[in-house]
Amino acid sequence: TTGEEFEAETIIVAAGYESRYITRSVGIDIPMTRYFEEALVTEMQPHMFDIMLGTADADFYGHQAQHGSFVFGSESGLEEATDMSLKELRTNSLTVSAGCRAIMGYIPLLADAKIVRTWGGWLDDCYDGVPVISKIDEVPGLIVACGFTGHGFGTAPAVGLMLSQMVNGEETVVDISALKYDRFKSTR
């Protein structure tokens, strides 16, 4: 910000991996890491699939859009320890090619398809693979929602509803006790 201060009775921290740094400023450490996921779009292809595609090994996932292009996502192999600032990090032929090889291994018909664009971003992942949607008892008025491991877009409507219920002191529409932050507390 421009140095301005804002106050509220309730604060929601939902900043992906950066949530870890924000909550650390008030003594809360959410054990999580990040990894860089990439996506690509091919030129239009003849119709092949009406379903979402993916592999058990998570080599890639994606679908064919109605107009014919394929949209795929895959891990880049870049992890949190990658020695690059977020401003420097870009998708490139070295990382995108690994995803392309995985896709062609399953769908050889796409071997000659041209890639028209790529993009990527960091995904946040709690160490147990389960997101945190929780009030933080140690900091009254603090609610955290993070660690969605790339599933944020799919779950956002339900998570938004539950966060609004939490802010208003209501019971959530589903039991989210398994998503509480305190599961990371030491039992000693």
Task: Report each predicted region and the residues it spans.
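Central helical "cap/lid" subdomain
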Residues: 4-49
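Active-site lid/adjacent beta-loop-alpha segment flanking the redox-cofactor pocket in flavoenzymes
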Residues: 44-141
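Glycine-centered tight beta-turn/hairpin loop motif at sheet-sheet or coil-to-beta transitions
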Residues: 1-3, 57
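Alpha-helix N-cap/helix-start capping motif
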Residues: 16-17, 88, 157
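C-terminal catalytic lobe of FAD-dependent flavoproteins
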Residues: 101-188
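Detector for glycine-centered tight turns/loop "hinges" at secondary-structure junctions
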Residues: 3-4, 68
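Short glycine-/acidic-enriched loop or helix-start segments at secondary-structure transitions
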Residues: 22-24, 82, 154-155
